[in-house]
Curated annotation (Swiss-Prot):
Nuclease keyword on record: no
Gene3D superfamilies assigned to the protein according to its UniProt record, in alphabetical order: 2.40.30.130, 3.10.310.40, 3.30.54.20, 6.10.250.550, Bira Bifunctional Protein, Domain 2 (3.30.930.10), Threonyl-trna Synthetase, Chain A, domain 2 (3.30.980.10)
Keywords, alphabetical: Aminoacyl-tRNA synthetase, ATP-binding, Cytoplasm, Ligase, Metal-binding, Nucleotide-binding, Protein biosynthesis, RNA-binding, tRNA-binding, Zinc
General function of this protein: Catalyzes the attachment of alanine to tRNA(Ala) in a two-step reaction: alanine is first activated by ATP to form Ala-AMP and then transferred to the acceptor end of tRNA(Ala). Also edits incorrectly charged Ser-tRNA(Ala) and Gly-tRNA(Ala) via its editing domain.
Catalytic activity: tRNA(Ala) + L-alanine + ATP = L-alanyl-tRNA(Ala) + AMP + diphosphate
Self-association and partners: Homotetramer.
InterPro entries, sorted: aa-tRNA-synth_II/BPL/LPL (IPR045864), Ala-tRNA-lgiase_IIc (IPR002318), Ala-tRNA-ligase_IIc_anticod-bd (IPR018162), Ala-tRNA-synth_IIc_core (IPR018165), Ala-tRNA-synth_IIc_N (IPR018164), Ala-tRNA_ligase (IPR050058), Ala_tRNA_ligase_euk/bac (IPR023033), DHHA1_dom (IPR003156)
Xref: Pfam families: DHHA1 (PF02272), tRNA-synt_2c (PF01411), tRNA_SAD (PF07973)
Protein name stated in the entry: Alanine--tRNA ligase
Amino acid sequence: MSKSTAEIRQAFLDFFHSKGHQVVSSSSLVPNNDPTLLFTNAGMNQFKDVFLGLDKRAYSRATTSQRCVRAGGKHNDLENVGYTARHHTFFEMLGNFSFGDYFKHDAINFAWELLTSEQWFNLPKEKLWVTVYETDDEAYNIWANEVGVPHERIIRIGDNKGGAFASDNFWQMGDTGPCGPCSEIFFDHGDHIWGGPPGSAEEDGDRYIEIWNIVFMQFNRQSDGTMLPLPKPSVDTGMGLERIAAVLQHVNSNYEIDLFRDLIAAVADVTGATDLSSKSLRVIADHIRSCAFLISDGVIPSNENRGYVLRRIIRRAIRHGNMLGAKETFFYKLVAPLIAVMGPAAAELKQQQAMVEQVLKTEEEQFARTLERGLALLDDELSKLTGDTLDGETAFRLYDTYGFPVDLTADVCRERNLKVDEAGFEQAMEAQRRRARESSGFGADYNSLIRVDSASQFSGYDHVQQHATVTALFRNGEAVDEIHAGEEAVVVLNRTPFYGESGGQVGDKGELKNATATFSVTDTQKYGQAIGHVGILTTGTLRVNHSVEALVDVVRRNRIRLNHSATHLLHAALRNVLGEHVAQKGSLVNDKYLRFDFSHFEAMKPEQIRLVEDLVNEQIRRNMPVQTEVMELDAAKEKGAMALFGEKYDDQVRVLTMGDFSTELCGGTHASRTGDIGLFRILTESGTAAGIRRIEAVTGEGAIALLHQQSDLLQDVAHLVKGDIHNLADKVRAVLDRSKMLERELQQLKDQQAAQESASLSSSAKLINGVKLLVSQLDNVEPKMLRTMVDDLKNQLGSAIIVLATTADDKVSLIVGVTKDLTGKVKAGELIADIAQQVGGKGGGRPDMAQAGGTDVQALPAALASVEAWVASRM
């Protein structure tokens, strides 16, 4: 009996756990240690710093089932998804890793045992082929002599990508750094499927499918191309869960495995599709996985960076739903079936289900408004096309006006055997980006160029003053040996009490001083394992290896501490009042206020805001100790500690506890007791994106200052209404009631005035070819009264064409009324359009009533004078 996808995932982890590997949870799809990476796209991403020697773990062997997304950037499978058997935007990468522990012998034997042992995957040995790098005799001999793979099924692959070490079987992290040969394992589906072995002319066929890649990191590539042996070689492996599931379930397409069969059935159910072989069903089944997990990991649809890639995937899925005949929003309805088929791998997604569904529903509703119009425009453009390529300007207009990502446009074109001029599209996009850059006025960010190899010891939990040594200096992003008075720079110390911005908490400010120099620190940032003090040297000269006294601005730090502790209380209070679906999605903690973003699908009600505020203040009054404890990450999770969105955690984590109310992982600085916070007041509650709410609040001195401001404001209002704070509501209510009464009386007077004006105007109507025409410019008449006057004049004149105008604030207001018996010859909308264009405006309306505005007051008399001739020509 074949294994389910969930059973295969668990079996892989169980196997390597039995071989002494630490089972490590999947990291977020948003990489937290690699700004060059759009999404997590391989199992090794979360261990990159370990392989680079910048991070250490408590274990030397690890195994994971890593969520991955490949859409956008270098790794972009989007256009192929749904059209091939194995392309996905989202997949799970099974992997085992050795950090200087075992190497080729164990890595190869582990893989072979898992794949072929009766206890595990029990694949036929004769169905497995392997490749090695051309000069990797060690790996070749292990496969041939120890494992026993016949020589004819071991293929050496050389440099087949146009350069030294540029090979399918040589892995490189970058132009420099760790690299090494790799060995890939292929499964032979049999001669009933076209394709040849790897390295052959037919290797792109579907007969021989790569199921596992084993990378042997044994070299450190230098900038001159030299390969130096690593002192501790490592292993990084990756096996696509969906691919191995297809093999073990005896199917040839990933979309035929149990997980996708169930998802495709769910897609058919919510869209009403009946043809289960439709490629659109595959597209949607794939896309709900990437979209749901990306949103769960904190990505929100937008027009830039990760948010734009997410929006592209969502909109591609919606378009395919449209092709299937979906008549209403459907995509969000697939989150629940996805959670069901993913099982334990969707535990975090399940906690965020309501928020994810709301984000998807909102995005679909927004796109539905422009989808049909955009498709109609695209159909029209394609019908006029003489060649086989849609121009880039049209593709850009579809993007800019109708929200069509270029790959969606390309999808539609591909279905008609047409192409898109993507180079032309990029030119139009770049022109728009250039305009945006020019209007923004932003300059270069030199700090983003800084790379620091050394580490800084942070002492700020216990100290606000520290003796330290300068280990590095950076000016305009470049390392220098010294800086001089007046120069802006970044100073790195061997140890520091300054907190580097992270976890939503801003960096510290203060001074670095010695006998001859003073450096004013205006911000503190992290650069890898180093802490950089950003600022300006106000006096003297500062050199590398100089000693300094690091002095944190204590008053500012204390205010930040209170605000940070309050965010923890706020988070717990929100979960208590709104529900456990609430999760932190971002924060800002500075010395003035705190800002907290969280997942919730609707605006908070006033009574909920009051409950949250009261609950936080109750915990402040309890004056609970704020305690920290360092423990294993898994132990912290078992304790119920909540993790901060988007933050990277080591194996040893700092757990912050506030009595029995709040337990979170946090590396920030905090109050000693909750009572130190003093007072908590919410300023605003608002929405930032679909499914994301934001609270801004103040604490301590800031909260008291707010109370004073509000009290002063109440006193001012009380003085204005001649009352006091105790009867203020009654006094304001009385003022409002009197104001409404006076407004009604004023309106009655205006109506009477309009009636009198209308009565006097009716006598000035002219007969034009037997039709009454009344044209008048009125003074001291509000524009909104013109309509009432036209209605009165129609009643008085019986059959007539009426044109009234007035001016106010250098603007012209026009109205034309035509009685219904005359609209066959004169239409109000046509007449007013002619008048409006003469006064620099435009307008329109019904045949019997139309309004317009203009900006050229001086042209109004001539424009009104032209009406008589215009009407006469039509009568």
